[in-house]
């Protein structure tokens, strides 16, 4: 998944080493708990060398968990997921939503019947742990009371076993990581500029062979369109094009629209993000401003 994710090329990676790239296959599940463990491990390695980790991306939920912690959510269970998917295929996702509503009405009110990924995860959490997502999130307050020393002690125990299941050994959930964070957003100053950038980026992807990239997955028996990786913006539309459900023009248009919608959701997150420094992409002094903010930050 190189083109559709805009992964940096080898020349750039050599100049600016990145971590947590190419760590799983598209058919594998990846949870918030796994990211927490992987990110913490890499951040420890970087700070041990006297360097400052730079976290870059667009998954706001992951950023929030790194900084604020999370209730102890169980790792993905493929057997449970398959059972839920089988029920959904037989009875429909509205039936799955009704099941969730019976055990966790709060989560059901937030998750639409048309959102299979989140529905599946919410029901999976309950079947694996015996607790609802709402119950686990309510336990968040007990996590916040942990000290930095406790975090290191518990994570050292976890780090002896790189399996993600080891996270369950941290009693009460995942505490926020023991770092001081400086948060930046870098975005175009107006919506028109943003939309132009999105359209240009999608066309660059197509010109660079994005359809051929998706076709490789389309032809693999172990890759399905309902998998998280293939539901990503761009990949979903390209898959539907290869499936004959969309024309090329429809695929391009829907891919651009879906990307705009994703950007809108990200900007909505950012509007309520605490202690955020907002910078503009067209500011020629943006790097100097960011460096000054970091240098003046109180750690």
Describe the residue ranges of each PLM region.
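Phosphate/pyrophosphate-binding catalytic cores of soluble transferases and nucleic-acid-acting enzymes
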Residues: 1-299
């Amino acid at each position: 998944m190189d083109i559709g994710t805009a992964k940096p090329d080898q020349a750039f990676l050599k100049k600016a080493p990145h971590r947590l790239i190419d760590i799983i296959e598209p058919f594998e599940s990846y949870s918030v708990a796994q990211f927490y463990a992987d990110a913490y491990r890499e951040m420890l390695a970087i700070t041990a060398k006297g360097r400052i980790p730079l976290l870059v991306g667009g998954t706001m939920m992951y950023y929030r968990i790194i900084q604020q912690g999370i209730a102890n959510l169980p790792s993905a269970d493929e057997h449970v997921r398959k059972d839920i998917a089988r029920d959904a295929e037989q009875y429909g996702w509205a039936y799955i939503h009704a099941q969730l509503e019976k055990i966790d009405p709060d989560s059901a009110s937030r998750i639409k019947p048309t959102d299979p990924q989140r529905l599946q995860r919410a029901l999976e959490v309950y079947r694996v742990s015996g607790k609802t997502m709402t119950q686990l999130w309510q336990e968040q307050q007990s996590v916040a009371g942990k000290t930095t020393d406790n975090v290191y002690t518990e994570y050292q125990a976890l780090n002896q076993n790189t399996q993600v299941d080891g996270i369950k050994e941290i009693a009460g959930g995942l505490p926020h990581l023991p770092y001081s964070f400086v948060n930046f957003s870098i975005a175009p100053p107006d919506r028109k500029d943003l939309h132009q950038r999105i359209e240009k980026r999608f066309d660059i992807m197509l010109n660079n062979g994005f359809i051929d990239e998706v076709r490789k997955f389309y032809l693999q028996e172990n890759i399905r369109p309902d998998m998280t990786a293939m539901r990503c913006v761009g990949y979903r539309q390209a898959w539907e094009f290869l499936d004959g459900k969309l024309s090329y023009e429809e695929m391009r248009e829907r891919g651009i629209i879906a990307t705009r919608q994703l950007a809108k959701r990200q900007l909505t997150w950012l509007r309520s993000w605490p202690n955020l420094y907002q910078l503009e992409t067209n500011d020629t002094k943006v790097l100097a401003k960011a460096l000054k903010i970091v240098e003046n930050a109180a750690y």
